[in-house]
Amino acid sequence: MQVLVRDNNVDQALRALKKKMQREGIFREMKMRGYYEKPSEKRAREKAEAIRRTRKLARKRAQREGIVSNGRTASVR
């Protein structure tokens, strides 16, 4: 991964690098590879993540179509 340093502004380059790494999922990957994960545990985790993603997508679709409220309650006075 490559980031340009402009005008010797290393802090800005580091922020850009961190943002790129976050988007690519490198931090999450490093965390996951920090210890051995059994293949059966990996399958179970991936299946749970897929279910979570599907539910989140369905919830967003329902909100967009107006079927379900967004979960916030309006205060009545």
Curated annotation (Swiss-Prot):
Protein name: Small ribosomal subunit protein bS21
GO biological process, one term: translation
Cellular component, GO annotation: ribonucleoprotein complex; ribosome
Domain of life: Bacteria
Alphabetical list of PANTHER family matching this protein: MITOCHONDRIAL 28S RIBOSOMAL PROTEIN S21 (PTHR21109), SMALL RIBOSOMAL SUBUNIT PROTEIN BS21M (PTHR21109:SF0)
Region (Disordered): 38-77
Composition skew (Basic residues), residue ranges: 53-62
InterPro entries from the UniProt entry: Ribosomal_bS21, Ribosomal_bS21_CS, Ribosomal_bS21_sf
GO MF: structural constituent of ribosome
Family: Belongs to the bacterial ribosomal protein bS21 family.
One Pfam family in the UniProt entry: Ribosomal_S21
Keyword set, alphabetical order: Ribonucleoprotein, Ribosomal protein
Stretches with biased composition (Basic and acidic residues): 38-52
